[in-house]
Regions:
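Class II aminoacyl-tRNA synthetase catalytic cores and aaRS-like
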Residues: 1-421
């Protein structure tokens, strides 16, 4: 080389150092052109190297796919782990899918509305994360498990078409492939029936695959539909995997599950939120199918009432679920009565919903996608942590930041909290 000092400097450079390289771009001689390489027809004649920052020895190897490295190490040094090309691809593709969804729904006249993160504890199927109030000692906010009530209140407010890329929090027991905080595509529409919501979501999913994942093939369009009863009888699950070839990484088998029972007996439920005899299977705000509304209003034959709920399943994983909602306050009230809620509790927990529905609220319905799970399946990853920038462990720990962590005695005192040993 004509720059021996550059050669000497290059010898001291180690992996992951940050450099500023100055040079002259030259056209390669024909015999040296690399045909299948980006910029393979040029080469850089380096005239100077400036070291901007040195790096300590990397605690993990970032030149491999990373699956062979213990996950605790990968999560502890996530800022290193994210440098590997596979993780860069996952995070960048996630951005592309979010942008595609936003652009698509914008064209369909949806508006994105941010709903509160500090809200009120209400039963939605899992434990709430609780946030103590310093100004109002002895009272607590809850972090939202979903924007369910807010999006319905937006329908009462005349928003008509709402969506949000929503952060949701659920305080669940240790489960390998669950995250305490996760992302949903949440949407709600006024003046719709079940078919309208399902058609919009089916088209959006098909377009995401066709435009952003052209190498993948959707097995069947339109998506097949199967009733909950048939799914349980035939496959023993309400998340059947319809792929003809499960070895084919590019095969996507979507299906809709419909005709769910509205209620199940409390003693048969995994997460009953009531001391009553009955609890909801999916969502207390769902509307029954038209032929079952009278049964709901009369509180008769409760176990046979079918809801307008629809779940979308991909390759054996539920990636979304929604329903048409009860837009009449009396119908919603009956749901809580069937669940054994006394009228004072209904008014205290859901009075705002009943008043909003009674204010002239249009019929409405919507859906929420488990966005992390969808990305995991599109990227052929083994778990959702591979498509989240900074995930927590199955036990809900952030190994990089060291949370959850104790707070100071001063903070506890300000909040009026005493720890019981």
């Amino acid at each position: 080389t004509s720059h021996p000092e550059v050669t000497e400097k290059a010898k001291e450079i180690r992996p992951e150092w940050v450099l500023k390289v100055t040079g002259i771009v030259n056209k390669r001689p024909d015999k040296n052109v690399k045909q299948d390489t980006l910029n393979g027809d040029v080469e850089l004649e380096v005239t100077n190297i400036e070291i901007l920052n040195k790096a300590e020895t990397s605690p993990i190897d970032v030149t491999t796919e990373g699956y062979e490295i213990g996950e605790e190490h990968r999560l502890k040094y996530r800022y290193f782990d994210l440098r590997r090309s596979r993780m860069q691809k996952n995070i960048r593709n996630r951005h592309k899918v979010v942008k595609f969804i936003r652009d698509y729904l914008d064209k369909e006249n949806f508006i994105e509305v941010e709903t509160p993160i500090l809200t009120k504890s209400t039963p939605e199927g899992a434990r709430d994360y609780i946030v103590p109030s310093r100004l109002w000692q002895g009272t607590f906010y809850a972090l939202p498990q979903s924007p369910q009530q807010y999006k319905q209140l937006l329908m009462a407010a005349g928003t008509e078409k709402y969506f949000q890329i929503a952060r949701c929090m659920r305080d669940e027991d240790t489960r390998g492939d669950r995250q305490p905080e996760f992302t949903q595509l949440d949407l709600e529409m006024s003046f719709v029936e079940r078919e309208d919501v399902m058609a919009l979501n089916e088209t959006l999913l098909i377009d995401i695959v066709k435009k952003l994942y052209p190498g993948k093939k959707i097995q069947e369009i339109p998506f097949p539909r199967i009733s909950y009863k048939e799914a349980m009888e035939k496959y023993g699950t309400d998340r059947p995997d319809f792929r003809k070839n499960k070895e084919d990484k590019n095969s996507l088998a979507f299906c809709w599950i419909v005709d769910f029972p509205f209620f199940e007996r409390t003693d048969k439920s995994d997460n009953a939120q009531t001391e009553g005899e009955w609890t909801f299977t999916h969502n207390p705000f769902s509307r029954p199918q038209n032929e079952y509304i009278e049964m709901l209003m009369n509180k008769k034959d409760i176990g046979n009432i079918l809801t307008t709920q629809y779940d979308v399943v991909l390759n054996g994983s539920e990636i979304g679920g929604g329903s048409i909602r009860n837009h009449e306050p009396e119908a919603l009230k009956k749901v809580f009565e069937i669940m054994g809620y006394p009228s004072e509790r209904i008014e205290k927990n859901f009075g705002h919903m009943l008043h909003a529905l009674g204010s002239g609220c249009p019929p409405h319905g919507g859906i929420a996608w488990g966005f992390d799970r969808l990305m995991m399946l599109l990227e052929n990853e083994p778990n959702i942590r591979e498509v989240i920038a900074f995930p927590k462990t199955g036990e809900g720990k952030d190994l990089m930041m060291g949370s959850p962590a104790p707070i100071t005695d001063k903070q506890l005192k300000e909040l009026g909290i005493k720890l019981v040993k």
